[in-house]
């Protein structure tokens, strides 16, 4: 890994003491709440529940949220010969900037390979205004190291990946006892999900990630 090591030789005077655990990572927090309600009579029972999970990851601007809602009702009719069971569930899941595996588009690459002889506080201001183009651009003087490496904070706040998943589940079952030893029944179930994924990369992100790398055709 010598090709990935850069920076001046360290000594007591020029070592800033950068440690990813202390300077980049943060404390992850996960909260979980749930509530349920059930009621009923001899011939009718109803159940409802709701649960939520909200979490913030150990890297900046990383979050995961999930909400679950469940409803179920069972009823009996005609001297308990007919039984109806219906249920419904809804799940909403949202996540922001989940970490990729490997080095590709991964903020941890820059965080781990940052030279210990440089000042981490200097790159915490991850963008600088360019008076020529009149936009703020990524500040990362270390280069990409041939592994699409970027400023970790730029990857966190300017390479945004947001995902939302909605899932609906409905089910119903109806049965009828024709005789003590014979019954007929029918069931139906619907399971539908919809996923929306959005990816935004601001100007000055690595060109290999933004698909702006252009190769001239051969003459």
Model-derived features with residue positions:
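Hydrophobic, lipid-facing positions within transmembrane beta-strands of outer-membrane proteins
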Residues: 31-35, 67-71, 168-172
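Short strand-turn segments of transmembrane beta-barrel domains in outer membranes
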Residues: 6-36, 46-62
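Transmembrane beta-barrel domains of bacterial outer-membrane proteins
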Residues: 41-50, 69-73
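Outer-membrane beta-barrel channels and translocator barrels
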Residues: 30, 41-42, 78-80, 177-179
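Surface-exposed loop/interface segments of Gram-negative outer-membrane beta-barrel transport/assembly proteins
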Residues: 1-16, 58-62, 68, 72-167, ...
């Amino acid at each position: 890994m010598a090709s990935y090591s850069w920076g001046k030789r360290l000594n007591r005077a020029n070592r800033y003491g950068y440690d990813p655990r202390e300077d980049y990572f943060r404390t992850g927090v996960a909260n979980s709440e749930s509530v349920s309600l059930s009621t009923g009579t001899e011939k009718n029972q109803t159940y409802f529940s709701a649960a939520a999970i909200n979490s913030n990851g150990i890297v900046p601007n990383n979050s995961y949220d999930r909400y679950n809602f469940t409803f179920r009702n069972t009823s009996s009719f005609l001297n308990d010969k007919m039984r109806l069971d219906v249920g419904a569930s809804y799940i909403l899941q949202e996540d922001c900037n989940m970490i990729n595996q490997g080095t590709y588009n991964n903020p941890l690459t820059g965080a781990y390979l940052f030279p210990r002889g440089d000042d981490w506080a200097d790159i915490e201001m991850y963008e600088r205004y360019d008076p020529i183009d009149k936009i703020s651009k990524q500040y990362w003087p270390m280069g990409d190291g041939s592994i699409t490496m970027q400023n970790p904070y730029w990857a966190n706040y300017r390479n945004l990946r947001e995902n939302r998943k909605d899932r609906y589940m409905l089910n119903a079952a109806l049965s009828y006892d024709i005789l003590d030893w014979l019954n007929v029944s029918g069931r139906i179930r619907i399971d539908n999900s919809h996923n929306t994924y959005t990816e935004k990369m601001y100007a000055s992100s690595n060109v290999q990630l933004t698909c702006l790398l252009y190769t001239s055709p051969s003459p």
